[in-house]
């Protein structure tokens, strides 16, 4: 079994609680920044969505999961 998943944890600031962000499955912290885990396959779309909502990307960290069983 070989399983690889490429995901990224993105720290976003500048998002404010509103009708659109209320529909998200993560809360906006009082510091004004949120951490969002994004799979590589949706990375571009999610960054565009964050930009449309007025967010600013503060940090991006890769999260790699690899399982190799022979």
Curated annotation (Swiss-Prot):
One of its GO terms (cellular component) is phycobilisome. It is a peripheral membrane protein. GO terms for biological process: photosynthesis. It comes from the Bacteria. InterPro entries: CpcD-like_dom. It is found in: Cellular thylakoid membrane. Rod linker protein, associated with phycocyanin. Linker polypeptides determine the state of aggregation and the location of the disk-shaped phycobiliprotein units within the phycobilisome and modulate their spectroscopic properties in order to mediate a directed and optimal energy transfer. This is Phycobilisome 8.1 kDa linker polypeptide, phycocyanin-associated, rod. It comes from Microchaete diplosiphon (Fremyella diplosiphon).
